[in-house]
Amino acid sequence: MGMKSGWLLFYLLVSLIKVIGSEQHWVTVYYGVPVWREAETTLFCASDAKAHSTEAHNIWATQACVPTDPNPQEVLLPNVTEKFNMWENKMADQMQEDIISLWEQSLKPCVKLTPLCVTMLCNDSYGEERNNTNMTTREPDIGYKQMKNCSFNATTELTDKKKQVYSLFYVEDVVPINAYNKTYRLINCNTTAVTQACPKTSFEPIPIHYCAPPGFAIMKCNEGNFSGNGSCTNVSTVQCTHGIKPVISTQLILNGSLNTDGIVIRNDSHSNLLVQWNETVPINCTRPGNNTGGQVQIGPAMTFYNIEKIVGDIRQAYCNVSKELWEPMWNRTREEIKKILGKNNITFRARERNEGDLEVTHLMFNCRGEFFYCNTSKLFNEELLNETGEPITLPCRIRQIVNLWTRVGKGIYAPPIRGVLNCTSNITGLVLEYSGGPDTKETIVYPSGGNMVNLWRQELYKYKVVSIEPIGVAPGKAKRRTVSREKRAAFGLGALFLGFLGAAGSTMGAASITLTVQARTLLSGIVQQQNILLRAIEAQQHLLQLSIWGIKQLQAKVLAIERYLRDQQILSLWGCSGKTICYTTVPWNETWSNNTSYDTIWNNLTWQQWDEKVRNYSGVIFGLIEQAQEQQNTNEKSLLELDQWDSLWSWFGITKWLWYIKIAIMIVAGIVGIRIISIVITIIARVRQGYSPLSLQTLIPTARGPDRPEETEGGVGEQDRGRSVRLVSGFSALVWEDLRNLLIFLYHRLTDSLLILRRTLELLGQSLSRGLQLLNELRTHLWGILAYWGKELRDSAISLLNTTAIVVAEGTDRIIELAQRIGRGILHIPRRIRQGLERALI
């Protein structure tokens, strides 16, 4: 029985030590932690546009973009791994909408060619030869009949008058209605709404930077061979992207960015291949013919810019590509494609004419206002590439009516441009498609295009937008001191916004040291970006009236302030306003962190990793913090109601004394009134019983028993406990008597309370003494148990050592004895041999 009780006490002691040793953690709020989450937001653009330029890109950029930052900042994030996915990048979709806006804004004031959807009589036209020495051989795929000279009736300035006008059209831009009577119409009249480009419109792309609004950041992957989809370990944060030239083209990527580490091929796991080179291949395109442009009035205030006459070869447009530079890059690209697709049996060829629109089957781009359509068979067909000399010449067509890529069912009429046109660009990549899955024997790879979003994905593959989440919660060892009023600290302004994420790769313990600086950086970064936006808006307010981008930039400004105010409102609801580290009274639940130890959290995890671990419980934690703060507010309200007890000295003020006198008068008046009422009631009761009232000055002795003698002069005799009741007269005597009785009553009650308190303290002291005695006995008993078990363990160890020593000694003796026998046997071998020989001789 004693042994069982000893084990029970030992178990209780161990449990007590375990409970005491386990440290309670509390939810702690941190403001300014380097945490971000993927987000979608409206980016704003920045460019070095020239307001005095009439070029379409400059006009649009002046109205839509802010000036670029002369000192762009980039902050590296060490020890950070981030996932990117270029195929789901919303930045590319936004850029697509922006470039559509650019084109539509450029064409907004131009004339719609609906009045030209009439029947036209057309004949072949070949242009005027300048001289035979300057003529070059026409390419077979261009055709000899290039132009149609068409006549049609057009409305004059007076709507009821018509006149016959003439104009030259390219063969591809008109469709025969009746081949017998040579009637034609424009190719887009029955399918699209055709808009005539303004005569002075030119498309010369300028670099455009996309920037994140305040409260957001742009993550950038700096790995040279990054495929655009997956994890990136070399990450930095920037405010704006690099300058992107919005060049519209198909098949070839012109004037894009280069890769720093070889050729990279990006596959969307369907059929698209985006190729990015690390070297450029120049392409020089020329239209040497000299168009003579004219204008035809087709209605009131409507002018159609047509081609009156062409001098020289009407379609001698071509592009030259250096075979010495193209061939090695194309061969390296083909080898990389074979590695990506995991096949060697791949056919590379150009598209046939019947495999899609001209924009897809040909290289389409804009050169100084003219739309070129070039045949790229000599670039992609191996047999033609081997036959081609230096340089590779691509025959090109020029179209006046073009299917716009911006909207389905929309076309553009590009007015003729006078003079010689020449454009030099750099090929930086390819847009390819392949047919045939992994189970097919043959795979065909051919150039493609048309989906301009792929061009922007190729430029924005290494970027993504994230929102800054500066509020974080984590377990802490400190608990908030309840019901105390503290001074609130105010934030100052600090360095740069991007520096806020500079501690992203640090552990939580290291990053929490710089929370004040990071919080200041966050606010100052918002203020800095607001100032940049505001200056840009003020400088361009007369231009922003023409564009919705002014509203978008103002929305970005308001959004940042709203996000900051929202965070401050949340902190205020939690009682953490103005604090970078705020302790709470909410106990930390270990299940929220998947039972991760306290030291592991603060020494091994970054804030971003910690946020991913507890993100699912954020709502629960925030709700508990808010409930705890509501309870804290209730407690503070109760305390403030008793706050006057903190200033006892104010009790002696003249105002208080007047209040005390008033209360005393009211109490005395009440007592006197009650006394008078009680006397009146007593007199009335006695009168009803037949007695007359005695004088109030008469002392009425109390009645004695007949057998009790009265008290003598010496004080002998039985003294009755009763006393004469004196009836006082007068107001002062009555008040004094009542106050005397009240004070005597209070004195007796106070004496009784002190006696009870003393008795309680005596009992408490006895209980405490008894408890200490029991604790001492428990300690003695536990010490005895520990001594007993220590002695038992020592005896067992000694016995074990003795037994081991005996066994070892016996074993050693046996081994020695066995060795001696073997040794004696070996020594006796010669003697045994000698004895054997002696017996043999006998």
From Swiss-Prot:
Q: Name one GO molecular function term.
A: structural molecule activity
Region named Fusion peptide: 489-510
Q: Which residues lie on this side of the membrane: Cytoplasmic?
A: 685-842
Transmembrane intervals = 664-684
Residues marked Cleavage (site): 488-489
Q: Which UniProt keywords apply?
A: AIDS, Apoptosis, Clathrin-mediated endocytosis of virus by host, Cleavage on pair of basic residues, Coiled coil, Disulfide bond, Fusion of virus membrane with host endosomal membrane, Fusion of virus membrane with host membrane, Glycoprotein, Host cell membrane, Host endosome, Host membrane, Host-virus interaction, Lipoprotein, Membrane, Palmitate, Signal, Transmembrane, Transmembrane helix, Viral attachment to host cell, Viral envelope protein, Viral immunoevasion, Viral penetration into host cytoplasm, Virion, Virus endocytosis by host, Virus entry into host cell
Which segments carry the region annotation V5? Answer: 439-448, 441-448
- Location of region: V3: 285-318
Residues annotated as glycosylated:
79, 123, 131, 134, 149, 153, 181, 190, 225, 229, 234, 255, 267, 278, 284, 290, 320, 331, 345, 375, 386, 422, 426, 589, 594-595, 604, 616
Which residues does the annotated region (V1) include?
122-149
Instruction: Extract the SUPFAM superfamilies matched here.
Output: gp120 core, Virus ectodomain
Q: Cystine bridges: which residues?
A: 45-65, 110-198, 117-189, 122-150, 211-240, 221-232, 285-319, 367-423, 374-396, 576-582
The chain's Extracellular topological domains, given as residue ranges, are 24-663
Please give the residue ranges the record annotates as the region MPER.
Answer: 641-662
Q: Where is this region: V2?
A: 150-189
Q: Is Disulfide bond found in the keyword set?
A: yes
Q: Name one GO cellular component term.
A: host cell endosome membrane
Stretch list, region Immunosuppression: 552-570
- Matches recorded under Pfam families: GP120 (PF00516), GP41 (PF00517)
Q: Which residues form the signal peptide?
A: 1-23
Q: How is it modified after translation?
A: Highly glycosylated by host. The high number of glycan on the protein is reffered to as 'glycan shield' because it contributes to hide protein sequence from adaptive immune system. Palmitoylation of the transmembrane protein and of Env polyprotein (prior to its proteolytic cleavage) is essential for their association with host cell membrane lipid rafts. Palmitoylation is therefore required for envelope trafficking to classical lipid rafts, but not for viral replication.
Which stretch carries the motif YXXL motif?
691-694
Q: GO annotations under biological process?
A: clathrin-dependent endocytosis of virus by host cell; fusion of virus membrane with host endosome membrane; fusion of virus membrane with host plasma membrane; positive regulation of plasma membrane raft polarization; positive regulation of receptor clustering; viral protein processing; virion attachment to host cell
Locate the coiled-coil region(s) and give their ranges: 612-646
Q: Which HAMAP family match?
A: HIV_ENV (MF_04083)
Q: What is this protein called?
A: Envelope glycoprotein gp160
Q: Which organism is it from?
A: Human immunodeficiency virus type 1 group N (isolate YBF30) (HIV-1)
